[in-house]
């Protein structure tokens, strides 16, 4: 059936499959097919979830077949993080602007970056060292004078999480502040990724499934 789907739809269906069924399906596919038919059309966080399910040899084979070198590099970096932390859950698809840019510069760069994304949750503002400085609401961009600098209209001190923050705390942060996405920073405050509410809901669902399976196993043992 998947052969009848276009690449984007096939990739989306794969991410929504039951984990065990997905692994059985991927085990019979060549690494090149997995890379070019699915991974090439996924966000980085979804691709990492898929590749984590493979053994190390197959992981390396899949990565070698990814044509976009930048995407492959992002996936390799994300695989280094513990999957139970913010780093293991985050994706790298973001719109990022510099705090000293003018509104016209900001708009130009946003258009370029947005072409590669399905959805834009927030525009993140960084300094010259890539440290997170603020969040840029789209409404402010529309209403601000063109001579304004981003740093003068951005929302300062945004809520963020660290790459090592446990997933449970990430979920609590998103719920507490009613966020649709939260930026992820490293030990020196550099912006390295973002976690969306959809990512969190997927994690909550997976945790519930694991808890159910554990409870079912315990009840059978009693």
Describe each region flagged by the PLM.
Residues 1-218:
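Hydrophobic packing positions in regular secondary-structure scaffolds
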């Amino acid at each position: 059936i998947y052969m009848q789907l276009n690449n984007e739809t096939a990739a989306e269906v794969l991410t929504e499959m039951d984990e065990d069924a997905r692994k059985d399906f991927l085990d019979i596919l060549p690494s090149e097919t997995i890379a070019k038919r699915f991974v090439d059309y996924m966000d980085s966080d979804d691709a990492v979830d898929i590749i984590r399910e493979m053994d190390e040899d197959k992981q390396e084979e899949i990565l070698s077949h990814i044509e976009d070198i930048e995407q492959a590099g992002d996936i390799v970096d994300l695989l280094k993080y513990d999957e139970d932390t913010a780093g293991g859950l985050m994706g790298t698809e973001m719109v990022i602007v510099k705090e000293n840019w003018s509104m016209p510069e900001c708009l130009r760069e946003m258009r370029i970056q947005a072409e590669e994304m399905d959805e834009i949750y927030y525009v993140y503002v960084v300094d010259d060292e890539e440290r997170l400085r603020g969040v840029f609401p789209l409404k402010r961009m529309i209403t601000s004078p063109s001579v304004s600098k981003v740093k003068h209209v951005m929302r300062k001190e945004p809520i963020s999480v660290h790459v090592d923050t446990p997933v449970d705390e990430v979920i609590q942060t998103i719920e507490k502040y009613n966020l649709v996405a939260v930026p992820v920073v490293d030990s020196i405050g550099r912006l390295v990724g973002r976690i969306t509410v959809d990512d969190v809901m997927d994690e909550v669902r997976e945790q519930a499934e694991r808890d159910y399976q554990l409870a079912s196993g315990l009840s059978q043992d009693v």
